Swiss-Prot record:
Xref: InterPro entries: Expansin_CBD_sf, Expansin_CellWall, RlpA-like_sf
Function: May serve to lubricate the movement of the cellulose microfibrils during cell growth and wall extension and/or may serve to maintain the fluid state of the slug cell wall.
Lineage: Eukaryota, Amoebozoa, Evosea, Eumycetozoa, Dictyostelia
Keyword hit for Glycoprotein: yes
GO cellular component: extracellular region
The organism of origin for this protein: Dictyostelium discoideum
Disulfide bond positions: C46-C70, C73-C134
Protein name from the UniProt record: Expansin-like protein DDB_G0293186
Highest taxon of the lineage: Eukaryota
Signal peptide per UniProt: 1-20
Residues bearing attached sugar chains per UniProt: N19, N117, N391
Start and end residues of each Expansin-like EG45 domain: 43-139
Keywords: Disulfide bond, Glycoprotein, Secreted, Signal
Record-stated family: Belongs to the expansin family. Expansin A subfamily.
Record localization: Secreted
Length: 421
């Protein structure tokens, strides 16, 4: 008897451990992240209960996709670590919320400070992100609602349901009522799924069955009688983590993989300053023109370049909010010329460096510097500098500032793909 109890406890303990793990269910991607004050106090546009054990996030309009990602969980990786958040809301104010190039996560300052430093910067432009299972314990919860007659629920013609505490995102919800000739697919409305009687169609009668399809193709069925309106009901079902239902080596590899920060965009500057880069912290200069047209009609140049006049011991300092990973940088290349000639121009990544370029003059010179000569020993850095280490004023023209990466640099696309086979 004692042995049986121990076995049961072991099984329950294992089940709890599995559910509390955030299984990786997509490839790694690159995104942007900003802090937004205190933690959310409601369920946002999705209308979901707050998860409590993890933080919440809002997504830009494109990524939120009319609520299709409500309740999904993502692991976010910044310069100081990782945290898991659940999508509960969308944002539509400002350029970051309206752009379609990247996922833009808006999270609480508390969660932001788990992965970055909100006192030092207000964005992480090289965020790593990955879809994960939410790791909730227990089963999926449902809240029903719809029409009413004389103050009593009547779902004959109109019916809606919302779900919470699901570990895998919900792709589709279907309904089959008693007497119905076919299954009806419910329409998603943010965090709710609605059914309306079509003209001449059958009324909803009970018992009925809901069929939930997860983003990985899993299906759960829940048979129920007429439910009370507005009350949370435990459906006694839960999506299984991918590794519990699949022997695919690819899925297993993805579930073990931890994402790093997102890969840097190739260019710091090409026709314009790359997203996330600023020159605010440059020092001892007379001017910085990021849209100079003084290309001298060189074939490899575009229409614009950087023109800067540095005083003696002045620096052109490119800063990237939220930092960037240096691990996979192979080299830095750019095109440059100077007037008067300069033999003391240093280039370095991070706060200090000592690599000095060959003497530069009026003719355009294409430079490639191995990363080992300019980067620090830190895995994460925040800046790139061109430093005039001499007491004379120089004008520099610089274009096509580009990072080159090692062959083993993992790709981090802007939009991740679920890894289910």
């Amino acid at each position: 008897m004692r042995t049986l109890k121990l076995i049961i406890l072991l099984i329950l303990s294992t089940f709890k451990t599995i559910n509390s793990t955030n299984i990786k269910i997509s490839e790694c991607g690159k995104a942007r992240c900003v802090p937004n004050g205190e933690s959310s106090t409601d369920g946002g546009q999705c209308g979901l209960p707050l998860p409590g054990v993890i933080g919440t996030a809002a997504l830009n309009v494109f990524a939120f996709d009319k609520g299709s990602r409500c309740g999904e969980c993502y692991e976010l990786t910044g310069p100081l670590g990782s945290t898991v958040v659940m999508i509960t809301d969308g944002c539509d104010a400002g350029d970051a919320c309206q752009q379609k190039e990247l996922f833009n996560f808006i999270i609480s300052k508390k969660d932001f400070n788990k992965i970055g430093n909100s006192s030092a910067y207000g964005n992480i432009y090289s965020l790593g992100y990955q879809k994960v299972s939410c790791g909730f314990s227990g089963y999926i919860k449902a809240v029903f609602g719809g029409g009413s007659i004389a103050g009593r629920p009547d779902y004959s013609y109109y019916f809606h349901v919302s779900f919470s505490n699901f570990n895998i995102g919900i792709k589709q919800v279907q309904l089959m009522g008693t007497g119905m000739s076919r299954i009806s697919t419910l329409k998603r409305d943010l965090g709710k799924y609605t059914w309306n009687q079509e003209g001449g169609g059958a009324k909803l009668q009970f018992p009925a069955t809901l069929i939930l399809t997860g983003i990985d193709g899993q299906t759960l069925s829940y048979k129920f009688n007429k439910p009370p309106s507005g009350q949370m009901i435990d459906i006694k079902k839960q999506f299984a983590p991918p590794t519990q239902k699949s022997s695919s080596a690819l899925v297993l590899r993805e579930s073990e993989k931890k994402c790093e920060m997102g890969k840097l965009p190739d260019y710091v500057y090409q026709e314009s300053l790359g997203l996330g880069w600023v020159t605010y912290f440059s020092w001892k200069f007379d001017y910085i023109n990021l849209e100079s047209h003084e290309t001298n009609k060189k074939a490899s140049m575009g229409k614009k370049l950087i023109q800067v006049e540095l005083k003696g011991y002045g620096g052109l300092h490119f800063t990237r909010e939220g930092g960037f990973q240096t691990k996979y940088i192979k080299s830095l290349s750019f095109t440059i010329r100077a007037a008067p000639p300069i033999s003391a121009l240093q280039v370095y990544v991070g706060q200090v460096g000592s690599y000095t370029l060959p003497t530069l003059g009026w003719q355009w010179t294409e430079i490639t510097i191995p990363a080992s000569k300019i980067k620090s020993k830190n895995d994460i850095e925040y800046s790139l500098s061109f430093y005039n280490n001499k007491n004379q004023t120089n004008t520099l023209w610089i274009d096509n500032i580009k990072w080159n990466f090692t062959p083993d640099c993992p790709p981090t696309p802007a939009f991740v793909t679920d890894k289910f086979i």
